């Protein structure tokens, strides 16, 4: 039972526990969407 529930929790929790990662992902997506040249968006 515990093993079956853990994987889903592991995938869902890190996003809430690590706001820095979510922020980086958001910033990366925003940069890529704003800048047509991905390599230079850095």
Curated annotation (Swiss-Prot):
Region of interest (Disordered), residue spans: 1-24
InterPro entries, A to Z: Contryphan_CS
GO MF term set: ion channel regulator activity; toxin activity
UniProt note: domains: The cysteine framework is C-C.
Free-text tissue specificity from the UniProt record: Expressed by the venom duct.
Record-annotated disulphide pairs: 35-41
Modification sites for Cysteine amide: 41
In-chain residues carrying the UniProt-annotated modification D-tryptophan: 37
CC per GO annotation: extracellular region
KW Signal (keyword) present: yes
Subcellular localization, as worded in the UniProt entry: Secreted
Modified residues (4-hydroxyproline): 36
KW Cytoplasm (keyword) present: no
Propeptide position ranges: 2-31
Task performed by this protein: Its target is unknown, but this toxin may modulate voltage-activated calcium channels (Cav) or calcium-dependent potassium channels (KCa).
Protein name: Contryphan-Mo
Keyword terms: Amidation, D-amino acid, Disulfide bond, Hydroxylation, Ion channel impairing toxin, Neurotoxin, Secreted, Signal, Toxin
Additional free-text comment from the UniProt record: Exists in two forms, due to cis-trans isomerization at 3-Cys-hydroxyPro-4. The cis conformation is the major form.
Major location (coarse): secreted
Signal peptide: 1
Family: Belongs to the O2 superfamily. Contryphan family.
């Amino acid at each position: 039972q515990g093993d079956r529930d853990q994987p889903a929790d592991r995938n869902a929790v890190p996003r809430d526990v690590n706001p820095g990662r979510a922020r980086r992902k958001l910033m990366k997506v925003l940069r890529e969407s704003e800048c047509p040249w991905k390599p230079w968006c850095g």
